[in-house]
Amino acid sequence: MNLRRKNRLWVVCAVLAGLALTTALVLYALRANIDLFYTPGEILYGKRETQQLPAVGQRLRVGGMVMPGSVRRDPDSLKVNFSLYDAEGSVTVSYEGILPDLFREGQGVVVQGTLEKGNHVLAHEVLAKHDENYTPPEVEKAMQENHRRPQRADKDTSS
C-alpha cells in the first residue's frame, strides 16, 4: 500500500468514527425526549410485532378511552384516578392537575407519563382527543343563529 492510499484510509476511518460518535451523542441527548406510544393492550401483552413489554419506570404515551364509571376525583386536591381501556384490556392512570375541558368518560385521551408497578401509569400530561367534526359550543350557537331561515318577504308583519 502506498502512502496516498494509507492517508485516504485514515481519512475515511476518521470520518466514519466521527459520524458514529455524532450519532451516539444525538441519540444520548434525545433519549430523555423519546416517549414510545402504547395502547392499554400493548402495556399488558406487549407490542404486536415484538411482544416486548414496557419496563417499569419507562416514559411513555398511552392512548385509549376513559372507562365509564372509573373517574375518581380527590375532593381536597386536583388528583384524579381513572382507567384507560381498549379492545384488549385496561390500565389505571393517576394524574394531578387540571384536566382538559374535553375530558370525560367514554372520550379518547392520550396520557404522557411513566409506567409504575401493576400496570399503573403516573401521568404528567393528559390530552383529550376529539374527532374532526368537533365544533366549539360558542361556534355552534353562532352558526345556528346565523343560519335561521329569514322571515318570508310576502308575509305582512305590520298587523
From Swiss-Prot:
- Write out the GO cellular component annotations: plasma membrane
Alphabetical list of InterPro entries matching this protein: CcmE, CcmE-like_sf, NA-bd_OB-fold
Membrane topology, from the record = Single-pass type II membrane protein
Please state where this protein is localized.
Cell inner membrane
Give the keywords, sorted: Cell inner membrane, Cell membrane, Cytochrome c-type biogenesis, Heme, Iron, Membrane, Metal-binding, Signal-anchor, Transmembrane, Transmembrane helix
Top-level division of the source organism's lineage: Bacteria
Report the Pfam families cross-referenced here: CcmE (PF03100)
Q: Name one GO biological process term.
A: cytochrome complex assembly
Provide the function of this protein: Heme chaperone required for the biogenesis of c-type cytochromes. Transiently binds heme delivered by CcmC and transfers the heme to apo-cytochromes in a process facilitated by CcmF and CcmH.
Protein name (Swiss-Prot/TrEMBL): Cytochrome c-type biogenesis protein CcmE
Q: Which organism is it from?
A: Salmonella paratyphi A (strain ATCC 9150 / SARB42)
- Name the gene for this chain: ccmE1
